[in-house]
Curated annotation (Swiss-Prot):
Highest rank taxon of the organism: Bacteria
Protein name: Tyrosine--tRNA ligase
Native organism taxonomy: Bacteria, Bacillati, Cyanobacteriota, Cyanophyceae, Nostocales
Residue ranges occupied by any S4 RNA-binding domain in the UniProt entry: 334-398
Chief place of localization: cytoplasm
């Protein structure tokens, strides 16, 4: 009986070859999966350039889980080294370079956020690697060897670089290193498959070239669509405000997903759920509610999904996040650590301070890392959501 690869086909934009490859398409990947005598090593890398992962990032993670469930090894690379350069893909100017401390703090939250997606428990199904393991050890000779595998012309063919060069916007030499470093990650972990968004085709192709250079069999590149945000217009992005964060309160998730435009619903179901597309309700409003329910259930469980649904149906526009009145604060300015104790999110100011230092406190989804954070006036906090860990929230109100 032929193996069912419907999980592989769902939501894929492209399984790509280099021009010289005759069989690097989805059928040859299926053949490799069906005949391999060992688990394939399936790579996905994410740079901790911010504290949050949103639903757009979950798409390759979900495909990675599909490979795990088929018996293969997911290699999740936390790009703690490459994050300090920043991927120039799609950028019209150089990214701000992060400090080592920025990256370390951001990386702390990533594994907790993806735990509901990936299989962390089955032996041999997951490796978590930090690319500083190998990239920080590259000497000048090895870096020169990597640089010698590509030409300036090849780099300028990359869409973001080409646009900037045409507009005479600066391109800094260290930015040319990013595709080579991402590619070298594939060499270091001996990847058989690399997952990425459609905007990552160039970088994944560089990985294939470097694997050939170092005598390895080149990886398959599996490209996945870029998720359009909740506005139905631009790609999901925190900076555009059209995102749903994995760390958000269940009620907030539910409310946002109920508002996904009708024309985007099928894409959301295909990329973010396992529900059969041909079994979806015909009514767009029913589809929106089903989408919200299904995704909240994935990340928070059925009870949380039911509570979020009931809150939305009863007119709870803020997703039933408990409220704390700032009138109960004796005086301002006030320290955030004190507020954590006063709201009951922590047992005391001291515990609040420790939670901040551990990276477990967020305000409107943004992690707060300074234990001495002070707010001067109540207006600074009106309507904002204070969070400790994954499941403790309050909305601050006047």
């Amino acid at each position: 009986m032929a193996e069912n690869f419907s999980w592989l086909h769902r939501g894929i934009a492209e399984v790509f070859p280099q021009p010289t490859d005759a069989e690097s398409d989805i059928e040859s990947l299926e053949k490799r999966l069906a005949t391999t005598d060992r688990p394939l090593r399936v790579k996905y890398g994410i740079d901790p350039t911010g504290a949050d992962i949103h639903l757009g990032h979950s798409i390759p993670m979900r495909k990675l889980r599909g490979f795990q469930d088929a018996g293969h090894t997911a290699v999740l690379i936390i790009g703690d080294f490459t994050a300090r350069i920043g991927d120039p893909t799609g950028k019209s100017e150089m990214r701000r370079q992060l400090t080592e401390e920025d990256v370390k703090q951001n990386a702390q939250t990533y594994l907790d956020q993806v735990r509901p997606i990936l299989d962390f428990d089955t032996p041999g199904r997951l490796e978590v690697r930090y690319n500083s393991e190998w990239l920080s050890r590259l000497d000048l000779g090895k870096i020169t060897e990597l640089l010698a595998t590509m030409t300036v012309g090849q780099m300028l063919a990359k869409e973001g670089f080409a646009d900037r060069y045409k507009k005479e916007n600066p391109i800094f030499l260290h930015e040319f290193l990013y595709p080579l470093m991402q590619g070298y990650d594939s060499v270091a972990i001996e990847a058989d498959v690399e997952l990425g968004g459609t905007d990552q085709k160039f970088n994944i192709a560089v990985g294939r070239d470097l694997q050939r250079h170092f005598g390895q069999k080149p990886q398959f590149g599996v490209l996945l669509p870029i998720l359009i945000g909740t506005d139905g217009v631009q790609k999901m992005s925190k900076s555009l405000g059209n995102y749903v964060s994995l760390s958000e309160h269940p009620g907030q998730k539910y409310q946002k997903l109920q508002g996904v435009p009708d024309q985007m619903l099928e894409q959301y179901f295909e990329l973010l759920t396992d529900l059969p597309i041909d079994k979806l309700p015909a009514n767009p409003r029913d589809r929106q509610m089903l989408l919200a329910w299904e995704i909240v259930k994935q990340y928070h469980g059925e009870q949380a999904a039911q509570e979020a649904k009931e809150a939305a149906q009863s007119g709870g526009k803020e997703g039933a996040v408990p409220e704390f009145s700032l009138a109960g604060v004796p005086q301002f300015p006030v320290k955030l650590a004190y507020l954590l104790g006063a709201t009951g999110l922590c047992k005391s100011t001291g515990e609040g301070k420790r939670k901040i230092q551990e990276g477990g406190v967020r305000l409107d989804g943004d992690r707060i890392s300074d234990a001495d954070t002070i707010f001067q006036q109540p207006d600074e906090l009106q309507g904002r959501v204070l969070q400790v860990g994954k499941n403790k929230f309050v909305r601050l109100v006047l």
